A protein has these predicted regions:
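Membrane-proximal intracellular helices of multi-pass ion channels
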Residues: 1-481
Length: 481
């Protein structure tokens, strides 16, 4: 494998990230040259210089292997997280080395967890940088880099095995460059529409843009310590529910529906399961909250119950209430939603509705085969017959996913973190959800937790964002031969 070629492509990603740092510095300058201006400007120059070295000294090549392409994807994520710490470390404040790494990984993986006790105390430029990391991460660092790497788009690089933000392997099969165009149109369009709607609902331009970027990236970063609860607006909640739910749908399906290539978005079996789960889960939580008299009005219970459930299923992590104070039944449903999550081909993390549907179909098929041993039963998803290898991959992924949650839980308890915090933190981190329960609840943060716990959860974030095996494979020596 040609490491220099991989470094060249990763270098382009670094330069692209440097542009967002420069844009954040511009926001800082417009805001009166706040204390983040020079840290952001210096970080931009440093990142651009580091990215320029391989571009200058490594000759451009038109062909790369699948293994090299794989390393471009994983390497871009890791490097993005590393250089993403620069503005935090140079600015200082609450950002120690561990805290800066955690915040950067949380942003680029669109997890949305934070170590900040007072988000509102951040300079506006640094605030915008946090949202830039999550917005870039939502689409995928590599996807953005492909916009300026047309040569890479002509190669047979299978991103859908590694890069979670690309279109899933189903009946939407496009060349890489067309995938980028589809993702960009849907992503930017949804962000713009959400920004305008939030502004009309009463937010200022900065808050509306930042929350739209966060919602469309299914991240959950907020400009306020109390998250969306700060605004206390049913209209804003409704707009964000729409944005989050839409961002959790397969982007290729959204594009096909909007352009008329597909007549009805509800024709997708996975989408029906996903939207049905959102409504059913939100309604069950509503009934639980109303019956427990946590909210005396049914409309208030429905507003908060639906919002929180949509927020965790789409792995966004916004909050309109402190779910630590809710019923045990509501907590169980929220944890279930944090594990299952939204559709493949979206910006969400987690196991994905697609895999859940296939797992249930496999169980049903197994029961039918016990009744009819000689029957040949095909499993279909959205009309496409699923190969045996693909079905095995689904079950292996689910088992690995649950084992990592268990490992993260045990690891946290070893270092003195209580069971609920360890478990929900592991679920929220590997699913890129953000908030959990206990000390990492929807109105809390990771600041008071041990540094080793923050590092283990940042590792879970990367594992979840890179589909587990995409990251683990790098540590097998035979793979590099």
């Amino acid at each position: 494998m040609r490491v220099d070629v991989v470094l060249r492509y990763v270098g382009v990603v670094m330069i692209f990230i440097a542009l967002f740092m420069l844009l954040s510095a511009g926001i800082s300058y417009v805001s009166g040259m706040d204390s983040a201006f020079y840290p952001l400007l210096l970080s931009s120059l440093l990142t651009a210089l580091l990215g320029a070295f391989p571009l200058i000294f490594v000759e451009r090549t038109e062909q790369i292997t699948n293994k090299e392409g794989f390393c471009v994807v994983v390497g871009s994520w890791l490097v993005a997280c590393v250089v993403g710490t620069f503005p935090y470390l140079i600015w200082g404040g609450e950002f120690s080395l561990v805290n800066a790494w955690f915040e950067s990984v949380s942003g680029f993986t669109t997890t949305g967890s934070t170590i900040l006790n007072d988000v509102e105390a951040l300079p506006r430029g640094l605030q915008f940088w946090r949202f830039s990391t999550t917005w870039v991460g939502g689409m995928g660092v590599v996807m953005f880099a492909l916009l300026i790497l047309p040569s890479l788009g002509r190669n047979k690089l299978t991103l859908s095995n590694v890069e979670l933000s690309t279109l899933a392997k189903d009946n939407y099969r496009y060349r890489t460059q067309i995938i980028v165009q589809i993702l960009l149109v849907v992503y930017v369009g949804l962000t713009v529409v959400s920004t305008l709607l939030l502004k009309m609902a009463g937010m200022n331009w900065f808050d509306s843009l930042c929350h739209a970027m966060s919602a469309c990236a299914t991240s959950g970063f907020s400009t306020k310590n109390a998250s969306v609860a700060y605004f206390n607006s049913p209209m804003i909640d409704t707009i964000l529910i729409f944005a989050m739910a839409t961002a959790g749908i397969h982007f290729g399906l959204i594009y096909a529906t909007v352009t008329g290539k597909r007549s009805n978005i509800f024709r997708s079996e996975v989408t029906r399961w996903y939207l049905g789960m959102l409504f059913a889960g939100g309604l069950l939580i509503t009934v639980s909250l109303y019956a427990a008299d946590i909210y005396p009005a049914f409309t208030s219970a429905f507003r908060h119950g639906l919002f929180q459930f949509v927020s965790v299923v789409t792995t966004t992590g916004f909050a309109t209430a402190d779910s630590n104070q809710w019923t045990s039944f509501a907590v169980i449903l929220l944890i279930f939603g944090s594990i299952v999550c939204a559709c493949a081909g979206s910006t969400a993390g987690g196991i994905k509705t697609n895999r859940l549907v296939l797992a249930m179909k496999m169980m049903r098929t197994r029961l039918r085969q016990q009744q009819h041993p000689n029957a040949i039963i095909r499993i279909r998803l959205d009309g496409v017959i699923q190969e045996t290898e693909a079905l095995h991959s689904v079950m292996i992924f689910i088992v690995a996913y649950l084992m990592l949650i268990l490992a993260g839980t045990v690891f946290g308890t070893i270092f003195g973190v209580d069971l609920m915090t360890s478990f929900s933190g592991a679920v929220a981190s590997i699913g890129n959800v953000g908030p959990g329960f206990g000390e990492v609840g929807s109105m809390d943060n990771f600041s008071a937790l041990p540094g080793v716990f923050k590092l283990s959860n940042s590792l879970l974030m990367l594992l979840g964002r890179l589909e587990i095996f995409g990251f683990i494979q790098l540590f097998f020596i035979k793979w590099w031969r």
